[in-house]
Amino acid sequence: MEGPRSSTHVPLVLPLLVLLLLAPARQAAAQRCPQACICDNSRRHVACRYQNLTEVPDAIPELTQRLDLQGNLLKVIPAAAFQGVPHLTHLDLRHCEVELVAEGAFRGLGRLLLLNLASNHLRELPQEALDGLGSLRRLELEGNALEELRPGTFGALGALATLNLAHNALVYLPAMAFQGLLRVRWLRLSHNALSVLAPEALAGLPALRRLSLHHNELQALPGPVLSQARGLARLELGHNPLTYAGEEDGLALPGLRELLLDGGALQALGPRAFAHCPRLHTLDLRGNQLDTLPPLQGPGQLRRLRLQGNPLWCGCQARPLLEWLARARVRSDGACQGPRRLRGEALDALRPWDLRCPGDAAQEEEELEERAVAGPRAPPRGPPRGPGEERAVAPCPRACVCVPESRHSSCEGCGLQAVPRGFPSDTQLLDLRRNHFPSVPRAAFPGLGHLVSLHLQHCGIAELEAGALAGLGRLIYLYLSDNQLAGLSAAALEGAPRLGYLYLERNRFLQVPGAALRALPSLFSLHLQDNAVDRLAPGDLGRTRALRWVYLSGNRITEVSLGALGPARELEKLHLDRNQLREVPTGALEGLPALLELQLSGNPLRALRDGAFQPVGRSLQHLFLNSSGLEQICPGAFSGLGPGLQSLHLQKNQLRALPALPSLSQLELIDLSSNPFHCDCQLLPLHRWLTGLNLRVGATCATPPNARGQRVKAAAAVFEDCPGWAARKAKRTPASRPSARRTPIKGRQCGADKVGKEKGRL
């Protein structure tokens, strides 16, 4: 009896021995953690943020589910880069300077739900870069430099629900671009340069409910393309240069509830423009050029019509609109621009009989005169009604391609020596880039009164003659980048009063063409990067009161004079990076109450004085000071900057010390990496402040030797012998109080008094 009993126990004992032998190895694998990371094994989270890592760490615990690598220097994601962490569900690779994702980079991550590749430098995605992500629900590619999408790129993402491609450089959507995305509900394509959508671009998206296409260059409503997404409930098309929408545009979306067409260039709307959108509930037309609107036929469930910011004329012709609004119970929020007796009146507060239909010729003449004083308005563009009328299509110039459906014409790279003529009269986008026109003559674009976007890049243009843009009253985008222009006259730009975006990068400008800008009252965005401008003087920005964005990166600017930016009181973005500024132009920032983003990186600043950003303290949200040779930051340098500041970039400087910045309480990002911090008692206030931040900032000790490589935030042992260490839980010392001696840089002093004396100079 004993023999059989012992033999049955042998198979049970061996597996137990194997498990006992493997247990230490498993425990070690679970407890390992890369030196540059923080591992929370209880929650299976690993964070390696802002550590200047150039490759994915290979000692990450195998059972990790959330891996945060944001803010490193990975540049390339190689094949099978994450094969050692197959349990990942969330992977964050934002701000990693990624330029290439190799084929098969994410193979083995079959459980991944979120992949964040936003804010990198990707120009393309290889065909199989996203293979192996069969469970992925959300893919973030916002803020890259993607120029094209290849069909099949997303074919392996059958579970994806949200795809974010906003803020890239897409100009064209090919057919079947999103093939395989059977469960995508939200597709974000906003803030690109999309002007053409292939007929089958949105095919194969049966679950799509929300499509974001705002802030692109669509100049005609691509109805047939959009209508492929039959399940759309919300469509965002705002801030596109659309001038007209009608039934002939072919928009048919039976489930559409919200349609946003705000901030465009709409001058007319056909009564049946949305006749095939029967469930439309909200229509947003704010900020267009509509002076009148017909009763809309078809969308019987419409309840909200947003019309703010349109020059509505509440004369007799608006009575049908008011009657329809009352009958259909549609709420509207527009206001009358005229006639004078109704100016400013809310449309919703008027009754049809408030709009007079004059019975005598004198009264009618008075109204016509008043409307003329209010300003000429282009006649509304409607559908063609027969041959020989305004929209009759002219022959296309030889060697060019004219597409009637999109109203686009292109002669790109045709070797032309002069601007051709004979384009269709309803052309809205004209692409003449990569030809050779030494000059653009007077009236070079006759009969193109509907033109919205004109591309003249890489044409060797050295001169725009007076009147070159004559007749282009609807032009909004003018691309003159990569030419030989050294100057621009006001006479050259006359005829394009609605021009909003002017691109002059990589020309030969020695100064900002201020006189020319005076001819552009609607200028919104000025691009003058990579020229040879050496200073900004008063008058350089003309009378550009509508100006919001100014890009002057990569010039030779050494001085920004007091008042140089004054006319642009609504300025939101100012890019002065990669210039020769030796000081922050504090005085020149006076009078910019709306400034949100200031780029000063790549200037030889060396030091920041007290109150350097005081004039824009209340509005500024993003401040870039990286790669500026900074060696000293005075205690009050950031005074005035408060809770509004969201990001502060100080990486790649020469900072050995930095005051604490407790007033910056709402920071979402602060980058202090690649600075040689000296971790002695002088740095104690910074250490204390950083320990209270739930952010990875990248600050590491360079000296003394016993602290080298330690994170300033975590190097408690370095500061234990400092005076006041025992009182670390007491109320913190304000940043402006000098808590330690500082060695000032020769010729540089902290103090607002000196700033005040020289604040207008650089």
Swiss-Prot record:
Residues 31-62, 387-425 form the LRRNT domain. Residues 1-30 form the signal peptide. One of its GO terms (molecular function) is collagen binding. Disulfide bonds join C396-C411, C679-C722, C681-C701. It is found in: Secreted; Secreted, Extracellular space, Extracellular matrix. Keywords: Disulfide bond, Extracellular matrix, Glycoprotein, Leucine-rich repeat, Repeat, Secreted, Signal. It comes from the Eukaryota. Gene3D superfamilies: Ribonuclease Inhibitor. Potential negative modulator of chondrocyte differentiation. Inhibits collagen fibrillogenesis in vitro. May influence chondrocyte's differentiation by acting on its cellular collagenous microenvironment. Associates with collagen and binds to collagen fibrils. This is Chondroadherin-like protein. It comes from Homo sapiens. The gene is CHADL.
